[in-house]
Amino acid sequence: ATAEEAAAYLDGKLDGKTIGIGGSVTIREMGLDQRLEKHNQVLWHWKHGTLQDAASTQVYLTSVNGLAETGELINIDGTGNRVASTIFGHEEVYFIVGVNKLAPDYDKALWRARNVASPKNAQRLGKQTPCAVKADKCYDCKSPERICRALTVLWEAPKGIGRSEVVLIDQELGF
């Protein structure tokens, strides 16, 4: 699907819901939050004061840092809110994923999450970590500004989630 087709699909599927959105450049690039706000209560991770509220919504939207063709969904998080919301507490979780995040297997998806997505996210957040400054790879730093503090690998939807779905977009989106 294209980004527009994926946005239309989710816009048609989600109506009258409370929706939490984790920090996701992919979702922001699609303008999905703006579409959904027209007929849902959307609590966006990046808007002040919504971090806790987004964790208790009916639906949660986020992306991944790496998606293995063997099925593993990999996310790295600094605060933990985004990864926690993919594991427990929501009726539905949707992972909106650009094709650039695909990797052939678990090891390459994890490598991508650590060495592509995390340095770009650290740069975006203005962190002074080695990966952000050098912009080339993870240094497994111990910086107080480190954004890589939690790692999740999902093989299937956890029992604490009603249902989950990966929406794959045939475009490069996000990090």
Residue spans for each PLM region:
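N-terminal active-site beta-alpha-beta segment that forms phosphate/nucleotide-binding
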Residues: 1-61
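Conserved phosphate- and dinucleotide-binding cores of soluble alpha/beta proteins
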Residues: 55-175
